[in-house]
């Protein structure tokens, strides 16, 4: 393989499932917590689960997928997925992301 050619892996974009809402990270609070503006209009305190903490780095402005808690569903949620720039552009074009 020559130096100038890179192969790109084609993979499917994870779409929101039942009970999951896309959102944009507004602020990093520390200790694995984020302030997320969700597509349904609520601002939730998002928690990064332990299995994602060390593997995925989340910054302000990133598009994430959150799953609201059973109780306090309008205030708190768990972060389920972080989208890349190209994935978030695709979601916006297809109408999944309305922010």
UniProtKB/Swiss-Prot annotation:
Highest taxon of the lineage: Archaea
GO molecular function, one term: RNA binding
Protein biosynthesis among keywords: yes
A Pfam family that the UniProt record links to this protein: eIF-1a
Keyword Nucleus: no
Start and end residues of each S1-like domain: 11-84
Keywords: Initiation factor, Protein biosynthesis
Family stated for the protein in its record: Belongs to the eIF-1A family.
Function: Seems to be required for maximal rate of protein biosynthesis. Enhances ribosome dissociation into subunits and stabilizes the binding of the initiator Met-tRNA(I) to 40 S ribosomal subunits.
Protein name, UniProt field: Translation initiation factor 1A
Organism encoding this protein: Methanothermobacter thermautotrophicus (strain ATCC 29096 / DSM 1053 / JCM 10044 / NBRC 100330 / Delta H)
Lineage, top ranks: Archaea, Methanobacteriati, Methanobacteriota, Methanomada group, Methanobacteria
Name of the gene this protein is made from: eIF1A
């Amino acid at each position: 393989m020559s130096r100038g050619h890179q192969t790109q892996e084609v993979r499917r974009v994870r779409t929101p499932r039942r009970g999951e809402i896309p959102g944009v990270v507004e602020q990093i609070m520390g200790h694995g917590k984020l302030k997320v503006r969700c597509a349904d209009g609520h601002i939730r305190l998002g928690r990064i689960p332990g299995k994602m903490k060390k593997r995925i780095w989340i910054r302000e402005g990133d598009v994430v997928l959150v799953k609201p808690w059973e109780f306090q569903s309008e205030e708190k949620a768990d972060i389920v997925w972080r989208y890349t720039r190209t994935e978030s552009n695709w979601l916006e074009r297809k109408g999944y992301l309305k922010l």
